């Protein structure tokens, strides 16, 4: 009905559409493709065979995305799934409680590994019912190699920081 309202009888493409026996969907897509190819220039023009081949699909089942398509491409192949790390949850290693072989192997190289694992075992053996509400954190062991580190910022960086502090707080004479 809309073709009558538009006055398409006078238009030459109306008779072309009647004479070509294409399905409606293919006609719309090929017209969009031909418009885009002529707008792009001579080097991007398609022949009719190439347009029909791309609209119908390739031998491997994939189809090129077309400008006029509203629905997503269901015929494109999905990427393969990544391999699963663990087949079942029982084979997943327990990170909170390391096995005794682990603590024995690393107790010589890391002195804090044994104390950390024993603290984890003691904490996991306690129930949640008998724990007090507020626990004090233990004082850190200063002989622990993980806690005794020094940061060397360098003289120039320290001088820049002091200069910035002097500029921001000119009333403070201590900088």
Curated annotation (Swiss-Prot):
Its main location: mitochondrion. GO terms for molecular function: small GTPase binding. Keywords: Mitochondrion, Transit peptide. InterPro entries: Cdc42_Effector_BORG/CEP. GO terms for cellular component: cytoplasm; cytoskeleton; mitochondrion; plasma membrane. Residues 24-92 are annotated as: Disordered. The keyword Protease does not apply. Residues 41-63 have a biased composition (Basic and acidic residues). One of its GO terms (biological process) is Rho protein signal transduction. It is found in: Mitochondrion. Residues 1-11 form a transit peptide. The keyword Mitochondrion applies. This is Uncharacterized protein C15orf62, mitochondrial. It comes from Homo sapiens.
């Amino acid at each position: 009905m809309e073709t009558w309202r538009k006055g398409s009888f006078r238009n030459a493409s109306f008779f072309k559409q009647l004479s070509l026996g294409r399905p409606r969907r293919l006609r719309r897509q090929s017209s969009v493709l031909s418009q885009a190819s002529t707008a792009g220039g001579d080097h991007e023009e398609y022949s009719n065979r190439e347009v029909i081949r791309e609209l119908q699909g390739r031998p491997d089942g994939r189809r090129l995305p077309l400008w006029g398509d509203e629905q997503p491409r269901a015929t494109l192949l999905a990427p393969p799934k990544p391999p699963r790390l663990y087949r079942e949850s029982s084979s997943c290693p327990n990170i909170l409680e390391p096995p005794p072989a682990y603590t024995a192997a690393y107790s010589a190289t890391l002195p804090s590994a044994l104390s950390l694992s024993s603290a984890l075992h003691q904490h996991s053996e306690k129930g949640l019912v008998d724990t007090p509400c507020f626990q004090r954190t233990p004082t850190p062991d200063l002989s622990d190699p993980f806690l005794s580190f020094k940061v060397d910022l360098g003289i120039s960086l320290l001088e820049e920081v002091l200069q910035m502090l002097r500029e921001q707080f000119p009333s403070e004479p201590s900088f």
